[in-house]
């Protein structure tokens, strides 16, 4: 069984490498709603974000909605990330199994820039006016274990981005499946994220006055007009991944993960990660993200988790660190409670 699992990991690695070396235009910066790509959970982030085949748990739903069908108990997750340039990212998820129906899931994602000074050519140090950039996504999902080996899930998201008095609102869908390949617990996961139509910004900040004929005199030189913005797609992403568990003893387990990614606004890449669990109390994690991506600025990730039971509930705290070539390192903390 271990040979089979290892061979499958190699297949995914080779596929991602072949895709990543292909000569293709990356289309970086050509999508809206890129905050949807910020992975919320510290567990997955510490594993290099190789999460499409992460074994069942509420933190896996972001990567693959199909894992929602594997959840066996109600759970609540809260995650906070100190993002670049003082930006904060917060995420709340709630999963509830309903006997005879399936599992339901709801989530709230919020990204906020804090106050930013308005600067103009005349006042480069600031006009005294401040504005904020705020992004919100509200999700509602459903997952079902179809057979003992196969589960699938679907999530709908209402997405809103606001820059001062200009905003865009749209709806996206996430869908995924996960399949257990053998009795050892090797999982194969596939997911599609942020599937939807194109969107564009509107708002009163786009209102201007317009002189239809600057050379004419006596006409209205301040006609009210509105600047139109182009429509852009959402940051779609395909994931295909494997997880391979290795049990050394009842008190020591290793989980290896690898996945290939195909985004619509960058080149193909690969994420890998490993998790070592000790005595169901402490977990050490490491990973590497966006391997083989053209001009990747990301790299190694590290983290840990501790868990324990209290009053019949399971509590888990996770931490993740991720490096960046040019910007500050990022830190995520996550709290999970399973009832």
Task: Give the positions of each predicted feature.
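Short strand-turn segments of transmembrane beta-barrel domains in outer membranes
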Residues: 49-52, 74-84, 320-322
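Alpha-helical transmembrane segments and their juxtamembrane interfaces
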Residues: 12-13, 74, 204
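Outer-membrane beta-barrel biogenesis signature
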Residues: 20-72
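Bacterial N-terminal signal peptides
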Residues: 7-16
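Short, flexible, solvent-exposed loop/turn segments with mixed acidic/basic and small polar residues
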Residues: 5, 66-68, 305-309
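Outer-membrane beta-barrel porins/channels
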Residues: 25-48, 89, 93-339
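N-terminal secretory signal peptides that target proteins for export/translocation
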Residues: 1-3
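Short, basic and Ser/Thr-rich N-terminal targeting/leader segments
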Residues: 56, 72, 87-88, 136
